[in-house]
């Protein structure tokens, strides 16, 4: 072979240089919550759930003492399959935020946690009240002299 032919062949061979084949774009599938809701709806239809009307609020009590509170939710139920579906925006709230209107909904476990909360608040208030009382007493003591037998402080005050 001729050296000139070899040089031309070497230049024509592309290894790592040039564009080559274009990169293939993959189609990204975005999974939306709408598809999840549709799947949930179809599985609930299989259970033959019925909507329950006139429910003002739903409260779910957690073990840590907090409550998941749903205001004006949509509720569907299937009593034979013991399935309840609650739709709406749930908010995590502390038990103390809902206390006046929630007392009739509390079970024995929740009542125990409510008692614990009440006791902890009382102990905190007593601790703060005791410290405040001591501080107030110390402030008042600066103006009042200590009583010592045999001395008359009336002349010093005037």
From Swiss-Prot:
Region of interest called Disordered, as start-end residue ranges on this chain: 1-40, 119-158
Compositional bias ranges of the Basic residues kind: 16-31
Domain of life, per lineage: Eukaryota
Record key words, sorted: Cytoplasm, Nucleus, Protein transport, Repressor, Transcription, Transcription regulation, Transport
CDD domains: NAC_BTF3
UniProt keyword Transmembrane helix, yes or no: no
UniProt subcellular location: Cytoplasm; Nucleus
Disulfide topology: none
GO cellular component: cytoplasm; nucleus
Gene Ontology biological process terms from the UniProt entry: protein transport
One matching Pfam family: NAC
Subunit (UniProt): Part of the nascent polypeptide-associated complex (NAC), consisting of EGD2 and EGD1. NAC associates with ribosomes via EGD1.
PANTHER family the UniProt entry points to: TRANSCRIPTION FACTOR BTF3 FAMILY MEMBER
Protein name as it appears in the record: Nascent polypeptide-associated complex subunit beta
Lineage, highest ranks first: Eukaryota, Fungi, Dikarya, Ascomycota, Pezizomycotina
Gene behind this protein: EGD1
